[in-house]
Amino acid sequence: MVNVLLLATEASAEKGFGLNLDLLDTNLINLGILIAVLLYFAPGFIGKILSERRATIEQAIKEAEQRQQEAATALAEQQQNLTQAQAEAEKILALAETRAQEVKQRIELQAEQDIERMKTAANQEMDSEKDKAIAQLRSILASKALAKVESQLQETLDENAQQQLIDSSIGRLGGQL
């Protein structure tokens, strides 16, 4: 085998048949041969692979477009739901504000009525206490006046004057009957 290499090297030195040790030239020639063989024998095989790949890519694109349309539809639906929810929230807020105002007015009216009722009750209680106090004062004054009159009558009237007073009082009562 060593002999073959020696012969090939000698032949290459004479520019004849032999091994070409220039790798760049050799690789280009080999690459050209490989491409020619592939183009001749493998167009159906490569075409089949490329068409399958193309079909796969087209299917992926269709699926992506379909998902995009579904997403757009879902987005539109969700935006509509959001708009409806916002409108409903605004209605609820307006209703709550209206109810709050109504409750506030009722509470204020009830408070005013309670204040008036308390004032009336206080005035009635004061009038009642005033009437009681006046009645007590009259009773006390009447008792004191009677006590004073009795004491004055006992001091100023003797028995004879008392008898004349009783007789005149009986006479007046007898005339009225």
Curated annotation (Swiss-Prot):
One GO CC term, this protein: plasma membrane-derived thylakoid membrane
> Transmembrane residues, as ranges?
27-47
Q: Which family does it belong to?
A: Belongs to the ATPase B chain family.
How does the protein associate with the membrane?
Single-pass membrane protein
This chain is encoded by the gene named atpF
Per UniProt, subunit arrangement is: F-type ATPases have 2 components, F(1) - the catalytic core - and F(0) - the membrane proton channel. F(1) has five subunits: alpha(3), beta(3), gamma(1), delta(1), epsilon(1). F(0) has four main subunits: a(1), b(1), b'(1) and c(10-14). The alpha and beta chains form an alternating ring which encloses part of the gamma chain. F(1) is attached to F(0) by a central stalk formed by the gamma and epsilon chains, while a peripheral stalk is formed by the delta, b and b' chains.
Q: Which InterPro entries does the record match to this protein?
A: ATP_synth_B-like_membr_sf, ATP_synth_b/b'su_bac/chlpt, ATP_synth_F0_bsu_bac
- Has the keyword Ion transport been applied to this entry? yes
Q: What's the source species for this entry?
A: Trichodesmium erythraeum (strain IMS101)
Q: Name one GO molecular function term.
A: proton-transporting ATP synthase activity, rotational mechanism
Name used for this protein in its record: ATP synthase subunit b
Q: What does this protein do?
A: F(1)F(0) ATP synthase produces ATP from ADP in the presence of a proton or sodium gradient. F-type ATPases consist of two structural domains, F(1) containing the extramembraneous catalytic core and F(0) containing the membrane proton channel, linked together by a central stalk and a peripheral stalk. During catalysis, ATP synthesis in the catalytic domain of F(1) is coupled via a rotary mechanism of the central stalk subunits to proton translocation. Component of the F(0) channel, it forms part of the peripheral stalk, linking F(1) to F(0).
What UniProt keywords are attached to this protein's entry?
ATP synthesis, CF(0), Hydrogen ion transport, Ion transport, Membrane, Thylakoid, Transmembrane, Transmembrane helix, Transport
Q: Which Pfam families match?
A: ATP-synt_B
Compartmental location: Cellular thylakoid membrane
Q: Which SUPFAM superfamilies match?
A: F1F0 ATP synthase subunit B, membrane domain
Respond yes or no to whether keyword Thylakoid is given for this record.
yes
Q: Highest taxon of the source?
A: Bacteria
